[in-house]
Structure formats: C-alpha cells, structure tokens
UniProtKB/Swiss-Prot annotation:
Keyword Transmembrane set for record: no
Short sequence motif Nudix box: positions: 46-67
Residue ranges annotated for the Nudix hydrolase domain, each copy included: 12-154
EC number in record: 3.6.1.-
Pfam assignment, any one: NUDIX
Family: Belongs to the Nudix hydrolase family. RppH subfamily.
Name assigned to this protein: RNA pyrophosphohydrolase
InterPro entries: NUDIX_hydrolase-like_dom_sf, NUDIX_hydrolase_CS, NUDIX_hydrolase_dom, RppH
Functional summary from the UniProt entry: Accelerates the degradation of transcripts by removing pyrophosphate from the 5'-end of triphosphorylated RNA, leading to a more labile monophosphorylated state that can stimulate subsequent ribonuclease cleavage.
Organism listed in the record: Rickettsia conorii (strain ATCC VR-613 / Malish 7)
Gene: rppH
Length: 161
C-alpha cells in the first residue's frame, strides 16, 4: 500500500446528509455539479453543522442547494451510508481533511413548483438540474457514489409510490 493510500485510509469521514427529493410524479431532483467539467450528476447533499440534527441539516441544505425548502421529510435512513472520494480529489475537497462522507439520507416530498427551484444560490453547487426517474438515477450518477446511491434507493424504494 502506498503512503498516499495509507494516509487516505487514515482520514475520517465528513458527517453529512443527503436528500432524495421527490416531485409529485415521484421523479428525483438531480443537479449537475458546477465544479467539474465531467457530467457529474448527484442528489443534493451537504455537511452537518456542529450541534445540528441531521433532519435540520437536510432541510437547511435543501434550501441552500435548490433555493427552496418547500417540502417535508417522509423518511430518514436507518443507517449512515459512506463513500470514499477518489484519492486525487482529497486535496481539493474539505481542505484535504476527509476521505469521503458518511451521510444520513432523507426522502423528502417537494411540495413546491419547478419555479420555486433556484440553483443560482449564494454558493451554487449545480449549473443544471432536472427530475430523473428512479430507473435512470443510477445510470447518471457520478460513479464513485453509485454504490451508496444503490443502498439509498434500496432502502427508500418501497416508500416511493
């Protein structure tokens, strides 16, 4: 094992939340990341501020990332899910302090309209957004998050009607 791999594995995971946001047609909000040239689509996610509960963090992050908090939590994941970022990204993310994220996931029903969504927030994360079907979600997600997304889909699938 190389020194950089060992250092990578010694780093902790950043605590965070992820949101599977459903519209009235049970399609899922996905955004294309603004900070990469590759087509990197993902569901909204973000960090937990010290002292904040995961559910409060999820609603705050929803507002920060899609410009709306019109919605309500249907379910919270039973587990913390984690993913590692590719080692070349570690120095570029979170000041190199984390190997990836461990996240609590939330299934959220969006009660607003498309016009309520504004990704041009004060710190934009996405340059495009759209609603994706459950079937297409896993095919458009950035590969290093795919295993985590498969687990989240498996947990929430029965609640998406």
């Amino acid at each position: 094992m190389s020194n950089s791999s060992k250092k990578h594995l010694d780093l902790p995971y950043r605590p965070g939340v992820g949101m599977m946001i459903l519209n009235a047609n049970n399609h899922i909000f996905v955004g294309k990341r603004i900070d990469t040239k590759i087509s990197a689509w993902q569901m909204p996610q973000g960090g937990i501020v010290p002292g904040e509960t995961p559910s409060i963090a999820a609603m705050r992050e929803m507002l920060e990332e899609i410009g709306s908090d019109k919605g309500y939590i249907i379910a919270e994941s039973k587990f913390w899910y984690s993913y590692d970022v590719p080692s070349f990204l570690i120095p570029k993310l979170w000041n190199g302090n984390f190997r990836g994220q461990k996240q609590r996931w939330f299934l959220i029903r969006f009660t607003g309209n498309n016009e309520d969504i504004n990704i041009n927030t004060s710190n934009p994360e996405f340059d495009q957004w759209r609603w994706a079907s459950l079937d297409e979600l896993l095919s458009i997600i950035i590969p290093f998050k795919r295993k985590l997304y498969q687990a989240v889909v498996k947990e929430f699938e029965s609640l998406i009607q």
